[in-house]
Amino acid sequence: DWRTARIEHAREVRDLLGGDYYVDYADDNFEDGKVVKLGDIIAYHNETTVDWLGGFVQANYTTDKLNLYGMGGISSIEYSYQDWFTVEQELVKADPIQTYQVKGGALYNVSDNLGVFINTGLVEKAPILDNVIDYSGNVATDPDNEKFLHNEVGVNFGTQKLGVRVSAYDTDWQDRNLTKSVSTGQGSSGDTDIIFLRGVNQKHQGLEVETKVKPNDMVELDFIASFGNWKFDGDAEGTYQENEYNDEGQVVGYTTTEYQYALNGLYVGDMPQTSYIVGLTVKPVKGLRLQALYKTYDKNYSDW
């Protein structure tokens, strides 16, 4: 499977707010500023490309009681960056980044009603372009791939009137690359600074329960519960990118500072770690389905 993308990034003048022109200082090819009008490009103008090549194989083995599944894959991604607002307009290319993934699972049917299963997988994800080539055209040396190591075990039980699935999981998410925005209120439009984080590790553990009760053909009762414990595992390094402004409040460059970010032990935010769902479905006549759901969420920590 081969895919390619070419993306142009630019900001365009759409409204002069009654003026005849605007002076932009972002283009280094115009030392004293560039007079722009409607439709002209300001602030930034660059082009990036992404080339992706990958493939995978999979296999499945089934008997009366046992089902085995496995797959393996490899991919390569290559980035380039060209800034039209620099004098050199150099085409910057990063070396191809290889990633791998291996997944496997097994289901054993103890009886007609009871089955146990296990799933495991190791997946790598290449860092995004922003973490490989920055706005100045600097290329990161040997950037780390994100890694997901996931293990899950569980049991299925089912009859004509009752179905139950219980599973426990443990996931190590290593070497994440995150981008965070910090509102500064500076500049002509209240621009934001950016933090590029490297080496962010998280551990996700939890238990999930799904139950379906069907006392007759007209009524179904569903109960789903999920109990998670997701935390950051260790601190991380980060580059703080701070915009620089001229007297008119326009961005004319930026400075970067390296920091250590104390993340160890913080809960992962912006997603509930505990949830309950109760549902009632009624089918009074053929073709008509009435459903009521009650959902509640807990341990939903704020992001940072």
Task: Please state what every model-predicted region is.
Residues 1, 68-72, 102, 116-118, ...:
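Transmembrane beta-strands of outer-membrane beta-barrel proteins
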Residues 2, 109-121, 144-236:
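Membrane-embedded beta-barrel scaffold of Gram-negative outer-membrane proteins
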Residues 2-111, 133, 237:
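Signature of Gram-negative outer-membrane beta-barrel scaffolds
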Residues 3-12, 80-88, 128-136, 176-185, ...:
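Outer-membrane beta-barrel translocator domains and adjoining extracellular loop/strand segments
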Residues 3-41, 136-142, 180-196, 242-260:
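Surface-exposed loop/turn segments flanking beta-strands in extracellular/periplasmic regions
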Residues 51-57, 100-104, 149-153, 164, ...:
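Hydrophobic, lipid-facing positions within transmembrane beta-strands of outer-membrane proteins
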Residues 62-65, 170-172, 196-303:
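Gram-negative outer-membrane beta-barrel transporters
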